[in-house]
Amino acid sequence: MFTMKKSLLFLFFLGTISLSLCEEERSADEDDGGEMTEEEVKRGILDTLKQFAKGVGKDLVKGAAQGVLSTVSCKLAKTC
């Protein structure tokens, strides 16, 4: 019985220490939350450019596909 109490007390002690370390880390992260690093700014700019390029690419493909389809339908209907 004594060893069981000792083990439980030891586990409680370890849990308390790990919890306090996590809280310290969390508070340190919250302190830095207001500032953006250069890497975060670059990542944000690159993501924006990537999304823009995807949108332009889709528009180009869509326009090209419509052009090809209209040409093919014109040739099939022999109205060109």
Curated annotation (Swiss-Prot):
Keywords on record: Amphibian defense peptide, Antibiotic, Antimicrobial, Cleavage on pair of basic residues, Disulfide bond, Secreted, Signal
Compartmental location: Secreted
Biological processes per GO annotation: defense response to bacterium
Signal peptide: 1-22
Pfam families: Antimicrobial_2, FSAP_sig_propep
Role, per record: Has a non-hemolytic activity. Has a broad spectrum of activity against both Gram-positive and Gram-negative bacteria, fungi and protozoa.
Designated name of the protein: Gaegurin-4
Source organism of this protein record: Glandirana rugosa (Japanese wrinkled frog)
Gene, per the UniProt record: GGN4
